[in-house]
């Protein structure tokens, strides 16, 4: 008791003071002595803030398992005796969690004694808590490291390739991304492109060997497909997986899911997305169906349509798997019942099954509901599908357009469903290009002219079309092309250059839709009119006398383009307007197949006595149209050829009618023709085969190295011909080889051999359709080589009696001039006229044909209206030298010749074959004559039919070789054929503004005045050439050769220069004009039928020595021929449907496009591809700069025969009717 009071001693006092200093603090903060623990804790907490705070917070983030371990470790540690460490040293640095975590810490310890010890001995707790807080962090770190190691091992396993393709390019990873009933899809990698791919393993254990082989072939075929809306196939091979053979497919990896997953996620698809994705699915299906042979998906559904994430487009997948699925589920419902068309259950289906499935896909996309979800099993679905009951979800479709499309796709009858083309042309799937084309008036289905409106969207009006600012224009079916119309609009400034493609595409789609609609209506009307049991009429009518064919033809029903009654066809369709093909019946030389039943009257029927046939030069094949009542086309009208297309002209007159009884068509058969023959290095023949399924196949074979059996076997193997057609194909190939070899020998043989080979007994006829029945009636036939070589092997009709003066031609029965003999002697020949009204018998003379070369080719040329003089009798002084037979022997008309003939067709034999024609020099002699013409007079009832044959002006070519070559196109031999009704100048009407589009209307030709006969026949003949018509036309010398003609010539040259034309200047001003002074220039142009000069036809002995120059001509001719054939083949492929359409209408009122084809050249130019012509040619699209009918383009074989390389290289036009210039 005294110690505390002793204040002098510092030690006891300091201890007491220390105790006193420590006691009041708990008294202030605590209510009892049992709370002695918190003060030291507070001190440790104070010291703990400085250093170990982050460490003390770690246990609060551990799991309950780790915390339990901590509690179990801390209990024994707390009961151990703690060394007497000062609280200042150990306690502050190793403190457990702060007091804020005290209640959880109590739960960690979980024992009352621990709490007592903790409260009574805080130093022990602090010291024991130190080791406890050090050990637990090491245990969770080890577990985390273990988990991290396992994750890395798993990733290494997944990223390690488990399989490799046989070539080592593709790797397979053990990452499964999809699984189906018969396939498993893994992630793969293309090591060449480092692009991820899909590795698909298909189970084929249930397939037989044949089915497995078939599936492998299908997969090989699918590997070549590449389309933006088709999942790409990269590779495939067979593999063994777990002892089972499987097929591995490597395809494009689609990581954004399918349409099915999209519908599950978003439930409702927006109309714009539905439109875009449906259009892309249609494009993919169209690509598949347009392959040869067509590829059917057979299992199209939303599960098989994949989404490409980055581009937002869709692609069709799982191609070719329907074969596998059908075998895998042979005893159950095959495919997906909800998307299967009714005919799928019968396994007799075509492309229509994919259209049905597409309709169901659209239904699911529009409603987000699975089709036939109300059915409980596949049997109920089958009953509904076969009975035509639509799914309940069909009536939930809100958009009428979508509902109409779905209804048209899921019809029970596959013939009533939409086609892919119909769907792509539907307004719902039409792309918004800012261009709209619509009909300005209701379509009656008959008129060839469509009045259309073109509306352009205005961006300033929110994309709506400009009101009352539509461009109205007239589109002539069969004559106009969408590209030409669009390019004219660009040239006229109506649309900008950037809108050329959208406008052309919009016009083309609208016109195609109208034509499809018309075709459906026409077929419906025919089915109503025709009885179903009408059989094809017999078509095996023999031709007139001649050697029988090597094999008889099979009776074949006349096609739509066979109902004609003329011998030679002329194709005067615009080469860019139609997508048809004429190879089946119209060869490149323009000859009609003689097997055409419409051209073969019964054998017992005699021909009309008025139909006399004359023999014309071998380079010609022409006929005169009958001028019946109501016939308003003339030879000039019918002979408007597209010079650049290389096609002959087709002049079907309005008077032609086909028997409406027969329009049913039989299955098409294969047709074969020769397109070219080459004997330069190897003797190679190029043929074109139209297969039974209307496909065009071009193949070549070596005459020396390939046998007909090998060719036929290859054709059968590739399914180009049917096995039943093999024998007929063999016969035709053998005949082709025989005839080609004969022709090649003729080319190399003497003139006598050529003369005998091309005897008048041979008449062009057609090869029959293969195969032919053995008992069919024999017919005359011509091989495909004869058709392709027809330009230089055209044979005249059989000889007959000469024309008597008392047998004039009546207007109703004009004569037909198949192939006459043409005399050639001197360098400059001019035609001599022949009139059907003759006072003297025409002298009969032996006929001979020109020896012609294999490289020669026909050159059809354009023409305009024909100026015809009155009947001109022959002069008695006409030379009758048997060695120079300029006479025209008249041949009796065989029964095969029609009563109604077509317009003249002329084939140019060879524009460049100079040396070859010299062999005929010794056989021919000059036959000069002069024809003086009378003034015009009104037309009389008697038709004038002068045939002008060439007579020669004695002039040397040695000093004027270049001049004569440049004048080649101005000095052709022009046989002029007339009729009682002739066409005047085909002037174009003044341009009118139809809406905003400048349209020029063409008028019907009227009758021109005929010129009376002249009783005299002079020594020298010069036919008049046409003056300038419209802006540019042919030129000619005037009667006196005065300044008027020179001025007209200069104007013509200037007009030609505006079109990019190179026209030679007049070089023979000093020459005396050959036309009589009293002969006026005719008021309408003469047709340009031929385009070669006498530098190539009338030869001298000097030219035969220039072999080097001839070789250049042959090379140039061969190049032009190849170009011509390629153009013709392309055009024929494009024109098939249109020509069939036009022919099928011949039984009804024919459209004006057929009646007056001469307007085709004067109305619109061919399409000029963008960037392929200079600016001057682009500007020539203006109406004021169009070339006249007498102008020809020289970008095809029908160009000028001049020797100038510059003019050959240019793609301009040249005047072809300057006959009066030498």
UniProtKB/Swiss-Prot annotation:
<feature type="binding site">
    <location>
        <begin position="251"/>
        <end position="254"/>
    </location>
    <ligand>
        <name>ATP</name>
    </ligand>
</feature>
<keyword id="KW-1017">Isopeptide bond</keyword>
<dbReference type="GO" id="GO:0010766">
    <property type="term" value="P:negative regulation of sodium ion transport"/>
</dbReference>
<feature type="cross-link" description="Glycyl lysine isopeptide (Lys-Gly) (interchain with G-Cter in ubiquitin)">
    <location>
        <position position="384"/>
    </location>
</feature>
<feature type="modified residue" description="Phosphoserine; by autocatalysis">
    <location>
        <position position="332"/>
    </location>
</feature>
<dbReference type="GO" id="GO:0005737">
    <property type="term" value="C:cytoplasm"/>
</dbReference>
<keyword id="KW-0597">Phosphoprotein</keyword>
<dbReference type="GO" id="GO:0010467">
    <property type="term" value="P:gene expression"/>
</dbReference>
<feature type="compositionally biased region" description="Basic and acidic residues">
    <location>
        <begin position="135"/>
        <end position="152"/>
    </location>
</feature>
<feature type="cross-link" description="Glycyl lysine isopeptide (Lys-Gly) (interchain with G-Cter in ubiquitin)">
    <location>
        <position position="1123"/>
    </location>
</feature>
<dbReference type="GO" id="GO:0005524">
    <property type="term" value="F:ATP binding"/>
</dbReference>
<feature type="modified residue" description="Phosphoserine">
    <location>
        <position position="572"/>
    </location>
</feature>
<dbReference type="GO" id="GO:0032991">
    <property type="term" value="C:protein-containing complex"/>
</dbReference>
<dbReference type="GO" id="GO:0035725">
    <property type="term" value="P:sodium ion transmembrane transport"/>
</dbReference>
<dbReference type="GO" id="GO:0002021">
    <property type="term" value="P:response to dietary excess"/>
</dbReference>
<dbReference type="GO" id="GO:0072156">
    <property type="term" value="P:distal tubule morphogenesis"/>
</dbReference>
<comment type="function">
    <text>Serine/threonine-protein kinase component of the WNK4-SPAK/OSR1 kinase cascade, which acts as a key regulator of ion transport in the distal nephron and blood pressure. The WNK4-SPAK/OSR1 kinase cascade is composed of WNK4, which mediates phosphorylation and activation of downstream kinases OXSR1/OSR1 and STK39/SPAK. Following activation, OXSR1/OSR1 and STK39/SPAK catalyze phosphorylation of ion cotransporters, such as SLC12A1/NKCC2, SLC12A2/NKCC1, SLC12A3/NCC, SLC12A5/KCC2 or SLC12A6/KCC3, regulating their activity.</text>
</comment>
<keyword id="KW-0808">Transferase</keyword>
<feature type="compositionally biased region" description="Polar residues">
    <location>
        <begin position="1172"/>
        <end position="1183"/>
    </location>
</feature>
<feature type="cross-link" description="Glycyl lysine isopeptide (Lys-Gly) (interchain with G-Cter in ubiquitin)">
    <location>
        <position position="183"/>
    </location>
</feature>
<protein>
    <recommendedName>
        <fullName>Serine/threonine-protein kinase WNK4</fullName>
        <ecNumber>2.7.11.1</ecNumber>
    </recommendedName>
</protein>
<feature type="compositionally biased region" description="Low complexity">
    <location>
        <begin position="1014"/>
        <end position="1032"/>
    </location>
</feature>
<feature type="region of interest" description="Disordered">
    <location>
        <begin position="877"/>
        <end position="896"/>
    </location>
</feature>
<feature type="domain" description="Protein kinase">
    <location>
        <begin position="171"/>
        <end position="429"/>
    </location>
</feature>
<dbReference type="GO" id="GO:0070294">
    <property type="term" value="P:renal sodium ion absorption"/>
</dbReference>
<feature type="modified residue" description="Phosphoserine; by autocatalysis">
    <location>
        <position position="328"/>
    </location>
</feature>
<dbReference type="GO" id="GO:0005829">
    <property type="term" value="C:cytosol"/>
</dbReference>
<feature type="modified residue" description="Phosphoserine">
    <location>
        <position position="1196"/>
    </location>
</feature>
<feature type="compositionally biased region" description="Low complexity">
    <location>
        <begin position="90"/>
        <end position="101"/>
    </location>
</feature>
<keyword id="KW-0796">Tight junction</keyword>
<feature type="active site" description="Proton acceptor">
    <location>
        <position position="318"/>
    </location>
</feature>
<feature type="cross-link" description="Glycyl lysine isopeptide (Lys-Gly) (interchain with G-Cter in ubiquitin)">
    <location>
        <position position="325"/>
    </location>
</feature>
<keyword id="KW-0723">Serine/threonine-protein kinase</keyword>
<dbReference type="GO" id="GO:0031404">
    <property type="term" value="F:chloride ion binding"/>
</dbReference>
<dbReference type="Pfam" id="PF12202">
    <property type="entry name" value="OSR1_C"/>
</dbReference>
<dbReference type="InterPro" id="IPR008271">
    <property type="entry name" value="Ser/Thr_kinase_AS"/>
</dbReference>
<feature type="compositionally biased region" description="Low complexity">
    <location>
        <begin position="793"/>
        <end position="807"/>
    </location>
</feature>
<dbReference type="GO" id="GO:1903764">
    <property type="term" value="P:regulation of potassium ion export across plasma membrane"/>
</dbReference>
<feature type="cross-link" description="Glycyl lysine isopeptide (Lys-Gly) (interchain with G-Cter in ubiquitin)">
    <location>
        <position position="1137"/>
    </location>
</feature>
<feature type="region of interest" description="Disordered">
    <location>
        <begin position="747"/>
        <end position="809"/>
    </location>
</feature>
<feature type="compositionally biased region" description="Polar residues">
    <location>
        <begin position="953"/>
        <end position="963"/>
    </location>
</feature>
<dbReference type="GO" id="GO:0004674">
    <property type="term" value="F:protein serine/threonine kinase activity"/>
</dbReference>
């Amino acid at each position: 008791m005294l110690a505390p009071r002793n204040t002098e001693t510092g030690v006891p006092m300091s201890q007491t003071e220390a105790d006193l200093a420590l006691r009041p603090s708990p008294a202030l903060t605590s209510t009892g002595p049992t709370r002695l623990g918190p003060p030291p804790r507070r001190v440790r907490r104070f010291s703990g803030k400085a250093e170990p705070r982050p460490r003390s917070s770690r246990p609060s983030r551990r799991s309950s398992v780790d915390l339990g371990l901590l509690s179990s470790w801390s209990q024994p540690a707390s009961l151990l005796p703690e060394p007497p460490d000062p609280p200042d040293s150990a306690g502050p640095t190793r403190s457990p969690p702060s007091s804020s975590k005290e209640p959880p810490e109590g739960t960690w310890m979980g024992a009352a004694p621990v709490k007592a010890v903790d409260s009574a001995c805080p130093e022990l707790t602090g010291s024991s808590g130190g080791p406890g807080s050090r050990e637990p962090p090491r245990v969770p770190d080890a577990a985390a490291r273990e988990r991290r190691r396992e994750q890395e091992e798993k990733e290494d396993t997944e990223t390690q390739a488990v399989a490799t393709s046989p070539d080592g390019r593709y790797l397979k990873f053990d990452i499964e991304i999809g699984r189906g009933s018969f396939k498993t899809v893994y992630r793969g990698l293309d090591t060449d492109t480092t692009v991820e791919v899909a590795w698909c393993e298909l189970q084929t254990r249930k397939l037989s060997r044949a089915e497995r082989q078939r599936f492998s072939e299908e997969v090989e075929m699918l590997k070549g497909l590449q389309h933006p809306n088709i999942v790409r196939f990269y590779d495939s091979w067979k593999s063994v997986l777990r002892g089972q053979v499987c097929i591995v497919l490597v395809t494009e990896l689609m990581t954004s899911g399918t349409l099915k997953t999209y519908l599950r996620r978003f439930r409702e698809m927006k109309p714009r997305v539905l439109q875009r994705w449906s259009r892309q699915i249609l494009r993919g299906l169209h690509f598949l169906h347009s392959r040869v042979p067509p590829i059917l998906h057979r299992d199209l559904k939303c599960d098989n349509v994949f989404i490409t994430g980055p581009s937002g487009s869709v692609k069709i997948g799982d191609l070719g798997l329907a074969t596998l699925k059908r075998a895998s589920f042979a005893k159950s419902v095959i495919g997906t019942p909800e998307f299967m068309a009714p005919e799928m259950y019968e396994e007799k289906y075509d492309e229509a099954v994919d259209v049905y499935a597409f309709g169901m896909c659209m239904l699911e996309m529009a409603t987000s509901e699975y089709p036939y979800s109300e059915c409980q099993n596949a049997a109920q679905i089958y009953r509904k599908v076969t009975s035509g009951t639509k799914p309940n979800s069909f009536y939930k479709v809100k958009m009428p357009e979508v509902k109409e499309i779905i209804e048209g796709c899921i019809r029970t009858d596959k013939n009533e469903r939409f086609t892919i083309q119909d769907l792509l042309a539907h307004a719902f799937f039409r792309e918004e290009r800012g261009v709209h084309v619509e009909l300005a008036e209701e379509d009656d289905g008959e008129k060839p002219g469509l009045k259309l409106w073109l509306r352009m969207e205005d961006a300033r009006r929110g994309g709506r079309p400009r009101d009352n600012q539509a461009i109205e224009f007239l589109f002539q079916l069969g004559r106009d092309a969408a590209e030409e119309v669009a390019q004219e609009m660009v040239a006229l400034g109506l649309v900008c250059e950037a809108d050329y493609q959208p406008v052309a595409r919009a016009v083309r789609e609208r016109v195609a839709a109208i034509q499809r609609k018309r075709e459906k209506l026409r077929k419906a009307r025919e089915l109503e009119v025709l009885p179903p049991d009408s059989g094809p009429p017999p078509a095996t009518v023999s031709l007139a006398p001649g050697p029988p064919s090597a094999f008889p033809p099979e009776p074949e029903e006349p096609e739509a383009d066979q109902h004609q009654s003329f011998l030679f066809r002329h194709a005067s369709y615009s080469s860019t307007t139609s997508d048809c093909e004429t190879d089946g019946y119209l060869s490149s030389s323009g000859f009609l197949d003689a097997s055409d039943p419409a051209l073969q009257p019964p054998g017992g029927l005699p021909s009309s006595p008025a139909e006399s046939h004359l023999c014309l030069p071998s380079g010609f094949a022409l006929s005169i149209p009958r001028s019946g009542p109501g016939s308003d086309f003339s030879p000039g009208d019918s002979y408007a050829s597209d010079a650049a297309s290389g096609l002959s002209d087709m002049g079907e007159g309005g008077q032609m009618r086909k028997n409406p009884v027969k329009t049913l068509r039989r299955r098409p058969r294969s047709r074969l023709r020769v397109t070219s023959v080459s004997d330069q290095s190897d003797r190679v023949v190029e043929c074109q085969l139209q297969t039974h399924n209307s496909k065009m196949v071009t193949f070549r074979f070596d005459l020396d190295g390939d046998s007909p059996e090998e060719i036929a076997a290859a054709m059968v193997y590739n399914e180009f011909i049917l096995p039943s057609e093999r024998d007929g194909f063999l016969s035709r190939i053998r005949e082709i080889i025989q005839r080609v070899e004969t022709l090649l020998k003729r080319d190399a043989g003497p003139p006598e051999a050529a003369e005998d080979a091309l005897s008048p007994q041979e008449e062009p006829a057609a090869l029959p359709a293969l195969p032919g029945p053995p008992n069919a009636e024999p017919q005359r036939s011509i091989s495909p080589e004869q058709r392709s070589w027809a330009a230089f092997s055209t044979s005249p009709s059989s000889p007959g009696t000469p024309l008597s003066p008392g047998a004039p031609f009546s207007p109703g029965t004009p004569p037909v001039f198949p192939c006459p003999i043409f005399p050639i002697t001197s360098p400059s020949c001019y035609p001599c006229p022949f009139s059907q009204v003759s006072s003297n018998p025409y002298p009969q003379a032996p006929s001979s044909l020109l020896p012609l070369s294999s490289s020669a080719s026909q050159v059809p040329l354009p023409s305009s209206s024909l100026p015809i003089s009155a009947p001109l009798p022959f002069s008695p002084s006409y030379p009758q030298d048997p060695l120079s037979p300029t006479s025209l022997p008249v041949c009796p008309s065989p029964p095969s010749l029609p009563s109604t003939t077509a317009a003249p067709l002329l084939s140019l034999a060879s524009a460049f074959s100079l040396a070859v024609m010299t062999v005929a020099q010794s056989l021919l002699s000059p036959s000069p004559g002069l024809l003086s013409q009378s003034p015009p007079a009104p037309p009389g009832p008697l038709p004038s039919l002068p045939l002008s044959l060439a007579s020669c002006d004695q002039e040397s070519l040695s000093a004027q070789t270049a001049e004569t070559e440049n004048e080649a196109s101005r000095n052709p031999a022009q046989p002029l054929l007339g009729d009682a009704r002739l066409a005047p100048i085909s002037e174009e009407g003044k341009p009118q503004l139809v809406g905003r589009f400048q349209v020029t209307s063409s008028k019907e030709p009227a009758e021109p005045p005929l010129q009376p006969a002249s009783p005299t026949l002079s020594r020298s003949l010069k036919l008049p050439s046409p003056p300038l018509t419209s802006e540019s036309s042919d030129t000619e010398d005037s009667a006196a050769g005065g300044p008027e003609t020179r001025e007209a010539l200069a104007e013509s040259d200037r007009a030609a220069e505006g079109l990019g034309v190179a026209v030679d200047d007049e070089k023979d001003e000093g020459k005396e004009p050959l036309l009589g002074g009293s002969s006026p220039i005719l008021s309408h142009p003469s047709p340009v039928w031929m385009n070669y000069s006498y530098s190539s036809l009338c030869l001298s002995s000097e030219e035969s020595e220039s072999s080097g120059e001839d070789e250049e001509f042959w090379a140039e001719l061969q190049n032009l021929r190849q170009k011509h054939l390629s153009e013709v083949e392309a055009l024929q492929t494009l024109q098939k449907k249109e020509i069939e359409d036009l022919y099928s209408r011949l039984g009804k009122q024919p459209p004006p496009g057929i009646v007056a084809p001469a307007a085709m050249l004067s109305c619109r130019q061919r399409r000029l591809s963008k960037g392929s012509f200079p600016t001057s040619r682009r500007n020539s699209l203006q109406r004021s700069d169009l070339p006249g009918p007498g102008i020809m383009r020289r970008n095809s074989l029908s160009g000028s025969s001049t020797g100038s390389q510059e003019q050959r290289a240019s793609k301009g036009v040249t005047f072809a009717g300057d006959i009066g210039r030498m």
